Swiss-Prot record:
Protein name, as recorded: Probable feruloyl esterase B-2
EC number(s) on file: 3.1.1.73
Enzyme's top EC category: hydrolase
Substrates-to-products reaction catalysed: feruloyl-polysaccharide + H2O = ferulate + polysaccharide
Highest taxon in the source lineage: Eukaryota
Disulfide partners: C28-C75, C63-C114, C187-C441, C256-C273, C282-C291, C503-C525
Transmembrane segments: none
Pfam families, alphabetized: Tannase
Length: 526
């Protein structure tokens, strides 16, 4: 039996941990009485122990989340914050016991008013004092924008900024040391919100991680809407079934997979891929379930073409080849894209009965002229953010089935041209990484595990985690040259099959050998 003297250090450590937990819990329980901020109504303050599977009964059904596992002890604060006389945001702050002195805001997705609880859990678990809001409305529909410009303004820019202002005040109030640096993490609409902060609120964040950004958003809505005019409805002679999209994908890989030097099912640089589809056009007498008709081949060519406006100006770049299988069930499914339909019905034309099947580029011109509250988020002069010392890191999956990765390249070029700076100077504050094999924000056939979300988490090493890479860049001045991604053997959370270092744009990955394509050292950024 061990002596009492030997046990004393362990007993003392255990007692200290329990005391710390009790102190944190007590501090959280009494925190509501200390909150007295303008326009803020506290709904509740709860202590949530690590390991809790938190029930979310008030989360809108369309948001799809009924519970969230919380990894670390947090103080959860739920609030309503007025943004005008007729609008408010629902805001949550998760303040962790393992606080690292860092503040972080999360974003949203689509047109949705859904707090992304998985991001709150992920980032608070890493020690960030984290906030997340519903962007001023509840659910995934665009209907709340109908005749409510204040709600729309919340969605465009005010929700995230308001959450940052309130969240920073709460962080200073709860932790004696306040916060030393502030960060942003978001993807899709969350990526657009990140760039809106860079463009409009340059002092809100020291570091912004903005994935697959939905900037150029008015034209994105039009681009998404125009696919129906190309495919037609299910059963039309221009429509491709999912099986035919699989056949098309195999042909695209046959033509383009080896361009990067390795035939691994991943196209490292889709901009080099211009598939010629004559090879799979049906021969006389051939079963049309195994090949494309001439009209179907034309459909594919149109999908892989940019969208131009009524005067011939570029509105939105092409969809990148390689994404077609995943996109076929969402963008090319023979139905108008729902977000686009909502946008035109409830905002552009303020007519819930507007027929989305009749969309044309003339509608795109009407929408772009409106651009309410500058939803476009396409301003290319981000010099104020640079002067404030901010860093922005953006990434985009090259299998993205919802937002073309070409659009992120287009914005990068716009910034370089507008600010008159070459890539090596942009690198000082703005870095862009193309993630081969990544679909929209997560998933895909390649090494998409970069730590941008809980579902893509591998570890917290800055080389393997895009958020912690940003922290290292901001706090230590070590900028990331590559972002290592993990390919999981059986989807998220499974073992790592292989890793690949994704290159900083404008470099691209090329297989040099001599190892297998699963060897990250067999690839080189050129």
């Amino acid at each position: 039996m061990p002596s009492l003297r030997r046990l004393l250090p362990f007993l003392a450590a255990g007692s200290a941990a329990l005391a710390s937990q009790d102190t944190f819990q007590g501090k959280c329980t009494g925190f509501a009485d200390k909150i007295n901020l303008p326009n803020v109504r506290v709904n509740f303050v709860n202590y949530v122990p690590g390991g809790t599977n938190l029930s979310l009964p008030d989360n809108p059904t369309s948001c799809g989340t009924t519970s969230q596992v919380v990894s670390e002890d947090v103080c959860r604060i739920a609030m309503a914050v007025a943004t005008s006389n007729s609008s408010e945001i629902t805001l949550e702050a998760w303040l962790p016991q393992n606080y690292t002195g860092r503040f972080l805001s999360t974003g949203n997705g689509g047109l949705s008013g859904c707090i992304q609880y998985y991001d709150l859990a992920y980032t608070s678990g890493l020690g960030f004092a984290t906030v997340g809001a519903n962007s001023g409305h509840n659910g995934t529909s665009g209907e709340p924008f109908y005749h409510h410009p204040e709600v729309l303004e919340d969605f465009v820019h005010r929700s995230v900024h308001t959450g940052v202002v309130v969240g920073k005040q709460l962080t200073k109030l709860f932790y004696e040391e306040g916060f030393k640096k502030s960060y942003y993490l978001g993807c899709s609409t969350g990526g657009r919100q990140g760039f809106k902060s860079v463009q409009k609120y340059p002092n809100d964040f020291d570091g912004v991680v903005a994935g697959a950004p939905a900037f150029n958003m008015i034209n994105l809505m039009s681009w998404s809407a125009h696919f129906y005019s190309i495919t037609g409805p299910v059963g039309s002679d221009t429509y491709l079934s999912p099986d035919l999209w699989n056949i098309t994908h195999k042909e695209i890989l046959r033509q383009c997979d080896g361009i990067d030097g390795a035939e691994d099912g991943i196209i490292e640089d889709p901009s080099l891929c211009s598939p010629v589809l004559e090879a799979i056009i049906c021969k006389p007498g051939q079963n049309t379930t195994e090949c494309l008709t001439g009209k179907q081949a034309h459909t594919v060519r149109e999908i892989f073409s940019p969208l131009y406006g009524v005067n011939g100006t570029l509105l939105y770049p092409r969809m990148q080849p390689g994404s077609e299988v995943m996109a076929s069930s969402i963008m090319y499914n023979g139905q108008p894209f729902q977000y686009s339909a909502d946008w035109y019905r409830y905002v552009v034309y303020e007519n819930p009965n507007w027929d989305a099947t009749k969309f044309s580029v003339r509608d795109a011109a009407v929408a772009l002229k409106q651009n309410p509250f500058n939803l476009q988020t396409w301003d290319a002069d981000i010099s104020s953010f640079r002067k404030a010392g901010g860093k922005v890191l953006t990434y985009h999956g090259l299998m993205d089935q919802l937002i073309s990765s070409e659009n992120s390249k287009l914005y990068y070029a716009r910034v370089a041209e507008t600010m008159n700076v070459p890539p090596e100077e942009l690198d000082e504050f703005y870095r862009f990484f193309q993630i081969s094999g990544m679909a929209h924000c997560s998933g895909g056939d390649g090494a998409y595990g970069i730590g941008n979300q809980l579902v893509t988490y591998n570890d917290a090493n800055p080389e393997n985690n895009v958020l912690m890479a940003m922290v290292q860049w901001v706090e230590k001045g070590i900028a990331p040259e590559t972002i290592r991604g993990a390919k999981f053997t059986n989807g998220t959370g499974s073992a790592v099959e292989y890793t690949r270092k994704h290159c900083r744009y404008p470099r691209r990955n090329v297989y040099k050998g001599p190892g297998n394509y699963t060897d990250e050292n067999a690839w080189q950024c050129v």
